[in-house]
């Protein structure tokens, strides 16, 4: 009998002081009540790059194909996937509708590869509200960002 595909939740967030500036990202993975936190940062980055990185790094931790719900407060990341922007950008050689080049192409390409492995749904959550996991991700991302401010 084939084992049922695992259902994983991933909460993500990115933080940046200045844009560009020092930044951090975080993800919390939840599977059957077990939680795993990851975080990291860069000395000179953008908020969007940190938001995308959080999703990519979270998905990279999965060791087998999973059903995944990604919760993000980044409308940019959620809409890029759920509204088909990402596929359109790729089809148009990474040129947006406004004729400008998409930023962070390498990360978007990595995300596309991961989306082909996992069945991923993105859900937009309100940032800095009452969502416990989003708030924890925010604190982790800010903490990593702050390491570059000292």
What are the residue ranges of the model-derived segments?
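Residue-level marker for buried hydrophobic side chains located in beta-strands
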Residues: 8-10, 70
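A short, polar/acidic, helix/strand-boundary loop motif
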Residues: 32-50
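Short beta-strand scaffold segments in enzyme catalytic cores
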Residues: 24-31
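RNase H catalytic domain
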Residues: 15-22, 56-136, 140, 145-147
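Short amphipathic alpha-helical face segments that pack within enzyme cores
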Residues: 49, 53-57
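Short, glycine/acidic-enriched capping/hinge loops at junctions between secondary-structure elements
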Residues: 21-24, 39
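A short acidic-Thr-Gly-centered motif at the start of a beta-strand
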Residues: 1-4
């Amino acid at each position: 009998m084939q084992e049922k595909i695992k259902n994983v939740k991933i909460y993500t967030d990115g933080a940046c002081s200045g844009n560009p500036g020092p930044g951090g990202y975080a993800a919390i993975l939840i599977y059957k009540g077990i939680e795993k936190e990851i975080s990291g940062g860069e000395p000179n980055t953008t908020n969007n790059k940190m938001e995308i990185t959080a999703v990519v790094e979270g998905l990279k931790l999965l060791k087998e194909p999973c059903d995944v719900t990604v919760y993000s407060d980044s409308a940019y990341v959620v809409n890029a996937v759920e509204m088909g922007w990402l596929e359109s950008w790729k089809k148009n050689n990474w040129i947006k509708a406004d004729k400008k080049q998409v930023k962070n192409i390498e990360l978007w390409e990595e995300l596309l590869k991961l989306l082909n492995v996992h069945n991923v749904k993105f859900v937009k959550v309100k940032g800095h509200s009452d969502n416990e996991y989003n708030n924890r991700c925010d604190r982790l991302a800010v903490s990593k960002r702050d390491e570059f401010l000292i």
